Amino acid sequence: MMKLSKLICPECQAENERNADACRECGHSLGFVNVNLLSDPYFQEGLEERYHAAIANLPGTEVQRFAEIIDREGQAVINMSFEVLRLLVNENEDYLSYQRGVEQGKIVKRTFQHDRFQCIVESAFYGFDGRNLVYAALSLDDNGVSAYGDVSVVLRKKNIEKRTTFFERDTFLLFDDLTEKGWKLKDIIPAGHCGTWRERTKIAAIKHGDQVKAGHQTADFAAMILKNGDERTDDEFIELHIFNKVGPTNFERITFQKKLTTPFERQQFKILKSKLSSLQVGVIEA
């Protein structure tokens, strides 16, 4: 059975398990578990191998230009409802992962079927700490996955890049893909499908390199990397996993994808806009 390498404490040099968050000897913080896991040579080498195989016969100049645009303009975007945004900003609440939200009584537990599947998938990829991850999508035009709400929130890169990992697609769909190909839950997930913030351009190139054409502009790439389908299972995007939580201080700008029509919504929008302005969060109206 494949085993990950040990994590060395930078303070006392003690060996720790790769999924440790604090040194077992001196208690020194070891960083973010999701990033530490995907920084292991097993994942790094597997991603590198798949990346080189994917781009071997592709036009290098065009793929490089695509990667540069992803690196420069790619954003982490979370879509949510107007009501959720209003709660986060007005009450200074945090946007939590599903499992942590349920634990704290802030998110209603889903049906047993959906609740069970989410917990299985998150633990299959990350173990215990799967419960600590907030999901976002990689975007080039500030638009996210509309199925989750009509408000798109762009996060500040400097607040999340050190605690974010990337998967080539929705992890629930990827889970199904891998199990259909024979992956067993007792095994570590196959390498080559995920990485850290540093590898985001390689993941994008693996997934979309063969679609890149000469003359493609940023808008073309934006439509390529994030597609909203008629059903959630039809959505296609590169998924970001942000460790812990995010809140209004992590927001960079917000786009309202539809007009607010009721007097109550318009009044609440004015209040929100004022509070967001005080946090230096940009607001784009539909």
Q: PLM features: what roles do these ranges have?
A:
Residues M1-M2:
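Short, intrinsically disordered linker segments that flank or connect zinc-binding domains
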Residues A124-A147:
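Extended catalytic/binding region for NAD+/ADP-ribose chemistry, centered on the ART fold
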Residues K6, A20:
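Residues immediately within or flanking Cys/His clusters that coordinate Zn2+
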Residues C9-C12, C23-C26:
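Short cysteine-rich clusters marking metal-coordination/redox-active sites
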Residues R86-L88:
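Hydrophobic packing positions in secondary structure, especially the a/d seam
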Residues G27-V35:
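Short Cys/His-rich micro-motifs in 6-15 aa windows
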